[in-house]
Swiss-Prot record:
Keywords carried by this UniProt record: ATP synthesis, Cell inner membrane, Cell membrane, CF(1), Hydrogen ion transport, Ion transport, Membrane, Transport
InterPro entries: ATP_F1_dsu/esu_C_sf, ATP_synth_F1_dsu/esu, ATP_synth_F1_dsu/esu_N, ATPsynth_dsu/esu_N
Annotated family: Belongs to the ATPase epsilon chain family.
Gene that this sequence comes from: atpC
Function in brief: Produces ATP from ADP in the presence of a proton gradient across the membrane.
Entry protein name: ATP synthase epsilon chain
Organism: Actinobacillus succinogenes (strain ATCC 55618 / DSM 22257 / CCUG 43843 / 130Z)
Lipid bilayer topology: Peripheral membrane protein
Compartments (UniProt record): Cell inner membrane
GO terms for MF: ATP binding; proton-transporting ATP synthase activity, rotational mechanism
GO cellular component, one term: proton-transporting ATP synthase complex
Assembly and binders: F-type ATPases have 2 components, CF(1) - the catalytic core - and CF(0) - the membrane proton channel. CF(1) has five subunits: alpha(3), beta(3), gamma(1), delta(1), epsilon(1). CF(0) has three main subunits: a, b and c.
Pfam families, per the entry: ATP-synt_DE_N
Amino acid sequence: MATFNLTVVSAEEKIFEGAVKSIQATGSEGELGILAGHIPLLTGIKPGIVKITREDNSEEVLYVSGGFLEVQPNIVTVLADVAIRGIELDQERILNAKRKAEDNIVAKHADVDHNLLVAKLSKELAKLRAYELTEKLVKNKR
């Protein structure tokens, strides 16, 4: 299968760069699967998981807080405010943040925007999913 160059950059650092067979992400209009030869595209991506299949068929999962995905001939770039490798996610920290977000939603504070609380919970759920997928990939390697 043909490959293309992928670069994933957060506001702080380059997270990934290399030859890949495919990338999956959630775009503003739905799920995206990008393979070599994909038509040029520029789209927003939603907070969630970016799944990468490398040249050697190994897979890596990243969490992104949202951003943009650009497809050019043989080059794909993901620009995200926050991008974290699945192996760097801390399950305990995620679960604590998730519980706090759930508690805040239930408390219904008048001075806090409910939509912001739901967005925070959604991000924590996406991080948890990225963590779980990474754990599954690690177990399958053993």
